Amino acid sequence: MKVLRWIWLALVLAGPVSAQGYRVRLDTRVHSVDFRGVQLDSVLRSATVPDSIGGLYTPDGYAVHCEPGDTYCTFFREGPRHESAPLVATADASAWGFGVRGLSAHATARLGYDLSSDGAWPGMEPAFQLITGYMEYAVERLTARAGRQVLASRLGTTGFDGGAVTWRMPKQRIDLTGYLGWGLARGVALPVTSPALNPLDDFQPQQRQIIAGLEGAWIGRIGDARLVYQREVDPHFDKFVSERVAISGSARPMAGLTVSGGADYDIAAGWWGSADLSVMYATRNITGTLEARRYRPHFDLWTIWGAFSPVPYKSLRGTVTGRPWRRLQLHARGEVYRFDPADASTPLVEYETDGWRGELGATVDAGRGWTIDGGVTREFGPGAASTGSGGSVTYAPTRAMRVSAYASWLDRPLEFRFSESVLKMAGFDGGIDLNERVRLTAGAMRYSENRNRPDAAAFDWTQWRITAGMVVLFARGADLENLPPAIRRMPGGRNAR
């Protein structure tokens, strides 16, 4: 398995050497972060001090948690400040012109390293990650890929090492896709057996899962439809990891009107997953969307999380964007939601199962490159609520230069903890194109957070974050001539749209 992976990587990275055309986009960013840590501490239960309502505290005023029968109680106290300086470099490469029409190579790789001595920044191991790396053969009716790939569908994002084939039937407007390979862990470009995922401990699979899927798509003038089937199998136990099917589609019955929706069914678990139905109407000056949604989280059968019977929620959401004047844009968003019954007995606690959230905002084009944006948000839901506002001012005198200053405020009280978070944030960021192939970026942010609570754990969480970056484009070949600067700045080039 590792041999095949390195063969694919060598073939892809060797592409620019033998190809007639290539494109390499190198995005390097460094951050400097200063943040407060916490320390787990304990105290003898006999040394705690009760308050008037039965709560227990340490002699110096920290609220503690005591398990029945335990000699010691635990609590968190203020820890030392940490400084981290993560450096992340992402390379996106494509090569073509190997002497075979339609043959190309593609790779996206990431290198991360913490320049500080603390080593407290998460996600730095392993230092090198191959996100994608595959050879592609594409002609009018056929596209075939071999290597590390990431496919997006109604079932989410699927990463695997293997092969994928798409067959197109232009007259029928039908595309058929099939793929097979060794799966990657969800949300990360690592196999599920990687040591970086060792917190799974005894639940970590001993072998990589085998993933297979089929997808059919019809794309017409007035709409489209897709059907997806996907299964994952653990070869060590010869058991299903997941098996799901999904359908989705959209229709455009008239100019400006789009109706779309879809649903998925978890065959392995035997229940319906997520579903949604939305209606969008757009004119020159106003756009509105109304969406009904049902969401249920999906967990693979090898994990322990499925045993907790994840509860779905249903929501109704609406958004409106209007432009009453040429230089003014208004937008509003609102949503109400409700969780299904959890079928859990809580005789001593009453809790909420529904909530709502909303947002109002405006964007003003002040002219001569100036843009002003601002808005307010409000949310009330199970366990917490929030009230906030924010705004930004952007100056972009040319396409090659932009600088923004922004600030926001958020008040977040918690229902089940005697703690209220008040967060204030201010910062700036900007970028400039030195030429068509080099772009520099920089920024700084200050987060000022206080926890209002009646014990000694109400300490300050204020931190600074400073960023700097450089994007460099190396290219050769007629296919890249006359590309707009906005396309060159995209993380995935033209394919990122």
Per-range role (PLM):
Residues 1-5:
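Positively charged n-region of N-terminal signal peptides that target proteins for export
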Residues 6-15:
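Bacterial N-terminal signal peptides
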Residues 19-497:
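Gram-negative and organellar
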